[in-house]
């Protein structure tokens, strides 16, 4: 009798711990008082397209659509640009309208992706123009870019053209988390953006590498070389010097496992900074992150150690792209979900959760 009661108790406890939420279809937030509705009924979330923030009319139209569709929450794209607050602030207007209509608000923020597809920034104050040396470089293009000064316009132009011609595998320009200065810049922008708006949670999109063949920029290679070199013997250093004389990828080629771990650790370090900054703004914010639809792709190609992110309480849940849209799984208290409870894997997409 006691054993049966224990099993029922465990089932009830598990049900309280994990709830699955399907964005654009339906999502259910986990059982935390600050992150859920007064009842345990499902909460419907409306994914706001960026184009809906262009004017007051489009903002009101999208809020009306959310209310008419019986959605309870809106996910609002927040731009990470230094001049995002100039002119009409569609995000602020949408949040005001949403609050007036008793809708909850989640901020949707691109982290490492700083330019999307063909939508490269017009303002020369944007980080892609001010610090092109911070942008990730694919290995295929690196031999050419390593011979160029990142400050000359031809450098960014070449990287942009390559990105446009490879849309099937990369969806924009990405800032590298390997450079400490770049990581500080990103963390600062995310903090400023969330401070500007009264939101209930933050969904971190594109907190990843586009693929395992990124980042082969000069700065990234130098950082990895500086990290590995002190651990080598004098003889190994001399040998690597000879290798580098003919192969600019000498250190990554000689130490592939360490190179992968280096990128994974630096990405996790960036997420750690983001989590600390966001919880300092508001400890009740839910922080979730987008991960690839395929688990191996997330770990081995995009360097997302998301299980450690959960167990270390860096995030409150994960989002996955599947055939039905975006699925968010909230996992409070750092408890890893059972594999069967993870969002089902559907179609993988280079574009992540866009």
What do the predicted segments below correspond to?
Residues 37-59, 291:
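Boundary/entry segment of secreted carbohydrate-active catalytic domains
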Residues 212, 286-325:
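Substrate-binding cleft/loops of secretory-pathway carbohydrate-active enzymes
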Residues 58-82, 197, 317, 326:
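Catalytic domains of carbohydrate-active enzymes, especially glycoside hydrolases
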Residues 45-53, 83-86, 169-184, 255-267, ...:
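The substrate-binding groove and active-site-proximal loops of carbohydrate-active enzymes
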Residues 107-192, 196:
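Active-site-adjacent "subsite" loops/lids of carbohydrate-active enzymes
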Residues 106-110, 203-210, 253-300:
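Aromatic-lined carbohydrate-recognition surfaces of secreted/lumenal glycan-active proteins
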Residues 314-354:
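Substrate-binding cleft of secreted/luminal carbohydrate-active enzymes
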Residues 52-67, 182-193, 297-312:
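Short, acidic/polar
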